[in-house]
C-alpha cells in the first residue's frame, strides 16, 4: 500500500469536492448541465458524522461527472478500493420518454440493468420536454412518469423526481437536493465504516514488527479527507489528531533508527501552515516518515481545518505548544543540525503563526474572554521570537546594544547557548571583520545612570560565551589554556525553557554530508590551534548563520545594528500591544519598558518617559522594589531632560521611598538634595506631590485621647520620616476623619510653626479645636516645603520605640481621638424642695454635681427672677455636699477626690458675689458642692384667713420664685450649662376661723386655728386680734381667752386659740363709713429650723447673730368675720330627693327653696332690684349633666316670709357618693344667707338598672 503514496497524494490534491456520477441514458446532460451547476452548492445538507449524529452542512459543493468520463473509467479495482474516497457518492440517472410502450419495452429494462448494483446510491431524474400547449404530449409524459414511479420507487424511499424543461420548476430543486444529500449521507456512512474497520485492524498491529505506518497513514488520511470534502471538519480534525498521537507513539520505537531530517534547503523556515511544501514521497523513510517534515505536515493539516472552522485562537494555542515541543526535539538533534537551526526555526514559526492567525481573526466575533486569550497567545509568540532573535544578535556581537534590563537578563541568562558538535570556525578571509568587531567591543561603554548610581550590569548570557565556544572546538580540550576563561569566574551552564537531556550518542555518529553546515572542524594551523577571541567567535557565528538562514528578510535584519534594532523594536512592540489587549497587561507594561530603553537611546525622551511611567507604576503596585530601582532612575533622567519638574520631583521622592539597601547613603542624600533644591527653586506653579511612601504617621501608643463635646485639646502624633537627612517643613497639617461618617471629610489641624523632621521617628503636637462627637482616626498629613505641597495618607503601625525606621502602610482601626456625645457634664439642683419664709432673708441651697468632668475655674452666674432678691451684704457659703444619693452614684457620675491633683482638705468657703457671678475654688472642681445663697422673697400682699365652712384654696404658684443659673466651665470656659430652679416661699401659718358657740348674752366664741406650713418648729409667743367695724372684744386687750404661751407648733401640725367677741350694737349703718373693713390677726412667733430641710431662722445682715436670735417675728393675717348665721336675711334649703333614689342615666329634678326671713336693708343689699334674686347652679361636669339653665333670675317679694322654688333637671353620670349640685346667690353676701345643709354634703347614686336586651336566659 505504501507504493501508492505518490499516487495517493496526486489524487488527493486533484480532488476537492464530492463527486456525483451522471448516467445520461437519453443524452440529456448537455441540456440540463447548466441548470444543475447553477444550483450548486447544496444549500442545506444534513449529514452524519463519525459518531452517527446529524450535522448541518451549509453550502456543500458537489461535482457532477458523467459516467463515461475518463476519470471514472480508467481505474483498476485495487485502485478503487484503495482510493475509495474519490469514487462517486451518488448516481443520477437522466431519462426522458413520451411513449408508454417505448418505456416498457426499451427504457425500463435498461434502467433495471443500470441500478442493479447494490453499492451505488442512485435516483432517477425524469426530464419532460413536452410543451405545455401540447396536451397530448403532456398526458403521455404524465403516464410514463407515473409508471416510472411505480416501478422504481417504494414506500421506504422515493427514488424519482421530475424536471419540466418548459414548465414551472416547482419544488424540483429542493427535492433534488434532498435526494443527493440522502445518497451522499448513505455512501459516506458506508465508506467511513469501511475505513474505520481497516484502521482498527492496523492499529492493533502497531507494536508488531510488521507494522507499517505508511499504510496506516493512507487509510487515516483518506478518512480525514472524506470528512474534509464533506465539510465535516471536526471529524477530519479528530482523525489528524489521532494520526499525530499514533505517529508520536511509534516514531521512536526501539530498534528502528530513523533520520530526523532538517538538512534540505530552506528547512530552517517553518512550514507549519503549508502542508504541500514537500511531497510525501520525499520525506518517507522505510515504513514511516522523517519527524522534522512529517510533524510540520500534520500540524499544517490541522491548522488548515481549524481555519476552515474559523478558530484562529486554537491555531495560535496549538501552534505555541507545538513550537515549544518541536524546539525540544530540535535540541535533541542540535549537534547534527545546522548552526542555530533551532533559534532560526522558532523565529520563522512564530512569525508565520502570528501572521496567519492575525489575518483570520476578526474582533468581536468570539467571546471577550477567548479574544483576550488569543491576544495573550499572540504576545507569547512575539515574546518567544523576540528572545530567540536577541540570542542570534548576541551571537554575532550585538550584545552591547541590547538593553541589560531585568527582563532581557532573565530571558537570555536562562536560555542555553547553541550546542553544535563543533563550534563554527573562523573563515580565512575574515580578518577585517574581526578587526571591526574588536573595535566595536572596545568602544562599547555602559550608560552611566543618573545621580551617579553605580550598578553591576545584569548578565545576558547563561555562561561565558568565550569558554563555551572554545570548549566546543574539536582540537581543544577544556581547561588547557587559561585564555579561554578570559579571566572570568566559571559559571554553570544554564538551562532554559527548551533545555533537554543530553543528545544520545547514537545521534552524534556521523552527520550526512551537506554544503550548508558549519559544524565541521575547519582548517587549523596546527593540531593544537590557539583559542578563538571573542571577536572571532562573533564573526564565525555570523558566517555560520548566513549559511543556515535562507530567509532573506531575517538575514537582512541581522546584517547591521540598525536593522537589528528595528526588528527587535517591532517584535517588542508586537508583544506589548497584544499583551495590552489580553489578560496579561502586566507583561505588556514590562515590554513597554524595553521599548522605552530604545527610545531613550535615540533621544525620544517623551516616549521613553511615558513608557517608563507605566513600568514604574506596575513595579510599585506589585511591590517589586528591586526592579523599580533599575527603572526609576531612567524615568527621572528623562523627566529632568524634558524639564518636567513635578514628575522629576515625584521620581526623586519615590527613589527615597525604596528600601534603604537598594541605594547607598550618598545616593539617597543626592535624591533628597534634588527634592529640596527643586522645592525652593523658582517653579512656575506649586507642585502637589504624594509622599505616602516616604512620610507616614500614627497615633501615640496607649488609649486614645478622650474629650467631651465642645472641648479643645492637644493631640500628639508620631510622624516617620524616610528622608536620609533632616528636612524642614514650612507647614504641616493633619486631617482627622470621623469613623461614623467618612464622606464629610475631616478637619485639618495645623502646626503653629515650621517643623524639622529628623530621619526616623518624630513626635509632633497639634492644637485640637472642639470636634463633633464620635471616634476619629488619622486621615491625611499635608504640608509644604518651599513650592512643594506634599500629601501623605499612609499609616505606621507604631512599632517599638527603638525601631525608628519601622514603617507600615496599613490603615489602623484604633481611633486616636474619641469625642463623647453630648451628655450632662454637670448638674445643678435646688437643695431644698420645701417652702421657705416669705418676706424674710432665707438661705437657698444650690447643689453642684460634676459628672466625670472637672469644674476647675468654673464661673456661676446667678440671676433672680421677679419677687426675689439676693442679700448682697452677706457672703455666699460653699460647702462639700455629702448626701446618700451622691455617695451611691459617685463611682458612676463623679471623679473621686483622691484622683484629683487638687487638695481635698477644705470643705467650706465663703465666696463673694461680683456682678452676679462667683468663681469656684479649686477644691470644689471634682466634688459635689452646695452653695448657700441669701435671698429674700418679696410680697406686699397680706395673708388672708378663711372660714372653716368655705376654706380658701392655697395657690402654690403665688409663692413660687425662680433663680436662673448659668455655669461656664471647661478649659476655655467653652462648656455652658444653664438651668432655672424654683423655690417655694410661703407664710408660716394658714389661718382658719369658725364661730364655735353663741352665748345667751350675745357673745360669740371665735376659734382661730393655726396650721403650720413650713418644715420647722414654730413657737407662738403672743397672739392678738384687731377687730373690724361691727365687732368688739369680750375682753378689752384683744388677747385670747386662755393663754398657754409660748405655744410650739410642729411641722404640719395645727394649733388653735379662742377669742370672745360681741356684736357692736351701738354702731349705726346710716351715714357712717367703715373704718376697718376686715379683722387683723397678729402672731408674734419664733422659728427653729434647718436650712437644709426648709424654712429656718432668717438671715439678718444688719445685725449680729446674737441680735438676730433676740428678734421675734410677727405674722399678720386678715380674716373676715361674717354676721352671725342665726340672723340671716335669706335662707336656701335643699329639698329632699325622690324616695326611689338616684340612678346613673336617670333624669331627676333638683329643687331648692329660697325664703326671705326679713327685709334686706339698703346697706346690706347689693343691688336696688330687691324683687329679683340672681341664682347660679354649680356642679361637677364629670359627675352631673345639667339639662336646665345654670344661671338666671327669679322673682322674690320683699315681704318677710315670701319664698320661691328653683328647679333644675340633671342626670347623674357616675355611681357612688358624690356631691350634688349647689345653688348660690352671687349678688347676696354670704353673711346674709343661711344654707341648709350648712356645708357640703354627699348623695348616693345607684348604678343603672340591667337591661333585658343584654341578658341571656339561664337554662
Curated annotation (Swiss-Prot):
Where are the annotated segments for Disordered?
479-526
Q: Where in the cell is it found?
A: Golgi apparatus, trans-Golgi network; Early endosome
Please indicate which superkingdom the organism of origin belongs to: Eukaryota
Per the UniProt entry, what are the Gene Ontology biological process annotations, in alphabetical order? cell plate assembly; cytokinesis by cell plate formation; Golgi vesicle transport
One Pfam family matching this protein:
TRAPPC10_1st
Q: Which InterPro entries match?
A: TRAPP_II_complex_TRAPPC10_C, TRAPPC10/Trs130, TRAPPC10/Trs130_N
Its keywords, alphabetically, are: Acetylation, Endosome, Golgi apparatus, Transport
Residues that the record marks as modified (N-acetylalanine) are: 2
- Phenotype upon gene inactivation: Cytokinesis-defective and seedling-lethal phenotype.
Q: Which GO terms describe its cellular component?
A: early endosome; trans-Golgi network; TRAPPII protein complex
Main localization category:
Golgi
Which family, according to the similarity comment? Belongs to the TMEM1 family.
Q: What does this protein do?
A: Specific subunit of the TRAPP II complex, a highly conserved vesicle tethering complex that is required for the proper transport of proteins in post-Golgi trafficking pathways to the growing cell plate in mitotic active cells. Required for the polarized and selective transport of PIN2, but not PIN1, to the plasma membrane. Not required for ER-to-Golgi as well as biosynthetic and endocytic vacuolar transport.
**Record text on subunit structure and interactions:** Part of the multisubunit TRAPP (transport protein particle) II complex composed of BET3, BET5, TRS20, TRS23, TRS31, TRS33, TRS65, TRS85, TRS120 and TRS130.
What's the protein name?
Answer: Trafficking protein particle complex II-specific subunit 130 homolog
Which source organism does the UniProt entry give? Arabidopsis thaliana
Amino acid at each position: 500500500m505504501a507504493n501508492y503514496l505518490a499516487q495517493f497524494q496526486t489524487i488527493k490534491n486533484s480532488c476537492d469536492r464530492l463527486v456525483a456520477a451522471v448516467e445520461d441514458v437519453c443524452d440529456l446532460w448537455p441540456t440540463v448541465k447548466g441548470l444543475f451547476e447553477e444550483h450548486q452548492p447544496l444549500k442545506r445538507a444534513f449529514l452524519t458524522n463519525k459518531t452517527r449524529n446529524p450535522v448541518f452542512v451549509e453550502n456543500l459543493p458537489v461535482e457532477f461527472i458523467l459516467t463515461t468520463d475518463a476519470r471514472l473509467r480508467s481505474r483498476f479495482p485495487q485502485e478503487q478500493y484503495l482510493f475509495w474516497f474519490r469514487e462517486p457518492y451518488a448516481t443520477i440517472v437522466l431519462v426522458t420518454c413520451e411513449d408508454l410502450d417505448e418505456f416498457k419495452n426499451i427504457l425500463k429494462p435498461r434502467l433495471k440493468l443500470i441500478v442493479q448494483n447494490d453499492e451505488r446510491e442512485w435516483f432517477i431524474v425524469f426530464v419532460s420536454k413536452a410543451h405545455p400547449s401540447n396536451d397530448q404530449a403532456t398526458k403521455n409524459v404524465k403516464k410514463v412518469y407515473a409508471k416510472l414511479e411505480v416501478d422504481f420507487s417504494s414506500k421506504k424511499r422515493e427514488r424519482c423526481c421530475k424536471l419540466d424543461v418548459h414548465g414551472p420548476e416547482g419544488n424540483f430543486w429542493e427535492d433534488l437536493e434532498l435526494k443527493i444529500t440522502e445518497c451522499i449521507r448513505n455512501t459516506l456512512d458506508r465508506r467511513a465504516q469501511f475505513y474505520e474497520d481497516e484502521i482498527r485492524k492496523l492499529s492493533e498491529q502497531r507494536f508488531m514488527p510488521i507494522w507499517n505506518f505508511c499504510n496506516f497513514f493512507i487509510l487515516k488520511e483518506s478518512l480525514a479527507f472524506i470528512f474534509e470534502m464533506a465539510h465535516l471538519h471536526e471529524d477530519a480534525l479528530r482523525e489528524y489528531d489521532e494520526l499525530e498521537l499514533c505517529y508520536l507513539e511509534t516514531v521512536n520505537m526501539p530498534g528502528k533508527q530513523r533520520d530526523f531530517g532538517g538538512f534540505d534547503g530552506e528547512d530552517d523556515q517553518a512550514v507549519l501552515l503549508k502542508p504541500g511544501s514537500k511531497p510525501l514521497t520525499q520525506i518517507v523513510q522505510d515504513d514511516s516518515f522523517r519527524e522534522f517534515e512529517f510533524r510540520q505536515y500534520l500540524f499544517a493539516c490541522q491548522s488548515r481545518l481549524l481555519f476552515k472552522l474559523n478558530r484562529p485562537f486554537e491555531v495560535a494555542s496549538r501552534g505555541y505548544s507545538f513550537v515549544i515541543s518541536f524546539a525540544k526535539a530540535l535540541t535533541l538533534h542540535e549537534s547534527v543540525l545546522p548552526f542555530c537551526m533551532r533559534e532560526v526555526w522558532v523565529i520563522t514559526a512564530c512569525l508565520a503563526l502570528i501572521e496567519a492567525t492575525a489575518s483570520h481573526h476578526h474582533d468581536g466575533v468570539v467571546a471577550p474572554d477567548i479574544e483576550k486569550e488569543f491576544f495573550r497567545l499572540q504576545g507569547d509568540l512575539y515574546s518567544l521570537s523576540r528572545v530567540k532573535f536577541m540570542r542570534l544578535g548576541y551571537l554575532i556581537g550585538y550584545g552591547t546594544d541590547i538593553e541589560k534590563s531585568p527582563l532581557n537578563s532573565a530571558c537570555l541568562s536562562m536560555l542555553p547557548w547553541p550546542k553544535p558538535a563543533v563550534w563554527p570556525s573562523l573563515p580565512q578571509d575574515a580578518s577585517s571583520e574581526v578587526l571591526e568587531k574588536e573595535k566595536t567591543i572596545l568602544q562599547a561603554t555602559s550608560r552611566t545612570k543618573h545621580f551617579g548610581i553605580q550598578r553591576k550590569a545584569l548578565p545576558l548570557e547563561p555562561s561565558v560565551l568565550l569558554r563555551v565556544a572554545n570548549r566546543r572546538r574539536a582540537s581543544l580540550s577544556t581547561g588547557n589554556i587559561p585564555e579561554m576563561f578570559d579571566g572570568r569566574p566559571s559559571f554553570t551552564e544554564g538551562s532554559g525553557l527548551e533545555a533537554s537531556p543530553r543528545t544520545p550518542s547514537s545521534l552524534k555518529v556521523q552527520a550526512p554530508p551537506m554544503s550548508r553546515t558549519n559544524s565541521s572542524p575547519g582548517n587549523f594551523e596546527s593540531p593544537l590551534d590557539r583559542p578563538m577571541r571573542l571577536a572571532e567567535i562573533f564573526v564565525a557565528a555570523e558566517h555560520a548563520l548566513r549559511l543556515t538562514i535562507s530567509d532573506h528578510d531575517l538575514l537582512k535584519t541581522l546584517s547591521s545594528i540598525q536593522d537589528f534594532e528595528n526588528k527587535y523594536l517591532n517584535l517588542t512592540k508586537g508583544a506589548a500591544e497584544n499583551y495590552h489587549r489580553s489578560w496579561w497587561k502586566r507583561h505588556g507594561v514590562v515590554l513597554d519598558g524595553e521599548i522605552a530603553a530604545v527610545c531613550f537611546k535615540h533621544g525620544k525622551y517623551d516616549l521613553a518617559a511615558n513608557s517608563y511611567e507605566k513600568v514604574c507604576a506596575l513595579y510599585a503596585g506589585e511591590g517589586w522594589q528591586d526592579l523599580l530601582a533599575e527603572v526609576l532612575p531612567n524615568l527621572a533622567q528623562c523627566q529632568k531632560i524634558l524639564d518636567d519638574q513635578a514628575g522629576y520631583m515625584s521620581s526623586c521622592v519615590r527613589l527615597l521611598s525604596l528600601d534603604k539597601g537598594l541605594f547607598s547613603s550618598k545616593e539617597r542624600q543626592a535624591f533628597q538634595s534634588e527634592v529640596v533644591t527643586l522645592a525652593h527653586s523658582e517653579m512656575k506653579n506649586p507642585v502637589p506631590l504624594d509622599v505616602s511612601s516616604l512620610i507616614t504617621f500614627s497615633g501615640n501608643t496607649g488609649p486614645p485621647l478622650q474629650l467631651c463635646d465642645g472641648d479643645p485639646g492637644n493631640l500628639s502624633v508620631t510622624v516617620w520620616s524616610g528622608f536620609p537627612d533632616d528636612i524642614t517643613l514650612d507647614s504641616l497639617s493633619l486631617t482627622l476623619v470621623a469613623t461614623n461618617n467618612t464622606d464629610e471629610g475631616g478637619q485639618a489641624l495645623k502646626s503653629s510653626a515650621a517643623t524639622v523632621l529628623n530621619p526616623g521617628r518624630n513626635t509632633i503636637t497639634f492644637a485640637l479645636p472642639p470636634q463633633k462627637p464620635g471616634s476619629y482616626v488619622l486621615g491625611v498629613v499635608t504640608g509644604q516645603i518651599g513650592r512643594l505641597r506634599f500629601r501623605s495618607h499612609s499609616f505606621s503601625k507604631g512599632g517599638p520605640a527603638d525601631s525608628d525606621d519601622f514603617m507600615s502602610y496599613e490603615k489602623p482601626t484604633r481611633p486616636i481621638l474619641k469625642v463623647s456625645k453630648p451628655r450632662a457634664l454637670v448638674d445643678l439642683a435646688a437643695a431644698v424642695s420645701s417652702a421657705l419664709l416669705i418676706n424674710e432673708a432665707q438661705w437657698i441651697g444650690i447643689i453642684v454635681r460634676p459628672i466625670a468632668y472637672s469644674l476647675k475655674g468654673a464661673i456661676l452666674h446667678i440671676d433672680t427672677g421677679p419677687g426675689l432678691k439676693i442679700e448682697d451684704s452677706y457672703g455666699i457659703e460653699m460647702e462639700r455636699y455629702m448626701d446618700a444619693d451622691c455617695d451611691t452614684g459617685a463611682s458612676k457620675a463623679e471623679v473621686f477626690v483622691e484622683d484629683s491633683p487638687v487638695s481635698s482638705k477644705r470643705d467650706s468657703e465663703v465666696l463673694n458675689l461680683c456682678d452676679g457671678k462667683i468663681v469656684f475654688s479649686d477644691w470644689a472642681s471634682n466634688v459635689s458642692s452646695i452653695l448657700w445663697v441669701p435671698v429674700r422673697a418679696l410680697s406686699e400682699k397680706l395673708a388672708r384667713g378663711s372660714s372653716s365652712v368655705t376654706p380658701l384654696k392655697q395657690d402654690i404658684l403665688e409663692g413660687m420664685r425662680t433663680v436662673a443659673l448659668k455655669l461656664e466651665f471647661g478649659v476655655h470656659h467653652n462648656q455652658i450649662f444653664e438651668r432655672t430652679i424654683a423655690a417655694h416661699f410661703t407664710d408660716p401659718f394658714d389661718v382658719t376661723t369658725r364661730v364655735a358657740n353663741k352665748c345667751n348674752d350675745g357673745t360669740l366664741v371665735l376659734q382661730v386655728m393655726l396650721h403650720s406650713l413650713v418644715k420647722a418648729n414654730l413657737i407662738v409667743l403672743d397672739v392678738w386680734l384687731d377687730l373690724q367695724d361691727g365687732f368688739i372684744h369680750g375682753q378689752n386687750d384683744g388677747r385670747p381667752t386662755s393663754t398657754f404661751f409660748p405655744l410650739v407648733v410642729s411641722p404640719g401640725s395645727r394649733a388653735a386659740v379662742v377669742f370672745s367677741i360681741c356684736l357692736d350694737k351701738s354702731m349705726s349703718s346710716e351715714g357712717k363709713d367703715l373704718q376697718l373693713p376686715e379683722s387683723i390677726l397678729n402672731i408674734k412667733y419664733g422659728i427653729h429650723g434647718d436650712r437644709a430641710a426648709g424654712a429656718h431662722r432668717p438671715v439678718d445682715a444688719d445685725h449680729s447673730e446674737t441680735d438676730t436670735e433676740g428678734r421675734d417675728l410677727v405674722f399678720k393675717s386678715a380674716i373676715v368675720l361674717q354676721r352671725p348665721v342665726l340672723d340671716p336675711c335669706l335662707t336656701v334649703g335643699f329639698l329632699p330627693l325622690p324616695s326611689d333614689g338616684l340612678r346613673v342615666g336617670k333624669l331627676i329634678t333638683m329643687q331648692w327653696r329660697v325664703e326671705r326671713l326679713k327685709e334686706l336693708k339698703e346697706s346690706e343689699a347689693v343691688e336696688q332690684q330687691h324683687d329679683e334674686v340672681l341664682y347660679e347652679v354649680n356642679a361637677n361636669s364629670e359627675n352631673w349633666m345639667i339639662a336646665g339653665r345654670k344661671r338666671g333670675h327669679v322673682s322674690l317679694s320683699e315681704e318677710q316670709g315670701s319664698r320661691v322654688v328653683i328647679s333644675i333637671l340633671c342626670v347623674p353620670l357616675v355611681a357612688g357618693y358624690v356631691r350634688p349640685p349647689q345653688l348660690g346667690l352671687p349678688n347676696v353676701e354670704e353673711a346674709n344667707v343661711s344654707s341648709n345643709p350648712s356645708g357640703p354634703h354627699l348623695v348616693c347614686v345607684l348604678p343603672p338598672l340591667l337591661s333585658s336586651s343584654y341578658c341571656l336566659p339561664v337554662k
